[in-house]
Amino acid sequence: MSAELGGRTGRQGKLSQWLRGRRPKETGAEEGGREALLLAAAGAGLPLAPAAYPAPGYRCSCDRVGCPTPARHPVSFAWQTQSTTDRAQIERWARHQPQANFITATGMVHDVLDMPLEAGREALERLLAAGIEVGPVAESDDGRLLFFTLTRGTPEDEDEWWPCELDCHPETMDEHPGLRWHCRGSYVLVPPARLPGDQGVHWVRGLEHPLPDPLSLLEILTDSGARYAGEEPDHAGAGWPLRH
């Protein structure tokens, strides 16, 4: 029994060290790996659209003076209708816009549960240790961990949609410093992406992992987020989906 416990503890310790370690910077984006990763994302069902990229001096490639989200927003205001999984279109974008980041529109096929990095790392450890299925996970060097999940409902079927107090949209990001739920009307950067200051967004768990039901992750994510915020988790209150 003690040997089994010791082995489990040792594995969890190694996982913890790996999650907290700095992984090498991705160089594949400059060597052709960028296009392959984007096509893999589209192949997994993530609709993509071109996004801005870093410009010298911590600026954004867009024309907006003092852009509040440099390199983190779509190029087109029509990103929701523009986003696609079409291989040929994504190849054209990737080759004609070699510096562009890409966003994936949420709420059509998938959602993203977006957490502060340390809380997210703890939650990921707990989920894996509990044997809960976890899908693709991306890490942003600006301090967020992104859990990719199935969507709660499709835009075509309004009866399958219900609101949640964690729902986050691009214009309300600052109102959600803790756990954010990117669903319909929102987006996130998809790896590989570059941020100002030589930062980036990269996969921690790849697209080979199936998208899980978001509700299977939510309790541990909420609990870990509350622990890092110094709050008591309220699983029966704010943060849980509310049907009407």
Give, region by region, the residue ranges found by the protein language model.
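Catalytic core of tubulin tyrosine ligase-like
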Residues: F147
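DNA replication initiation modules
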Residues: T151-H244
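Signature for HUH/AEP ssDNA processing cores
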Residues: S2-D142, R152, L207-L218, T222-H244
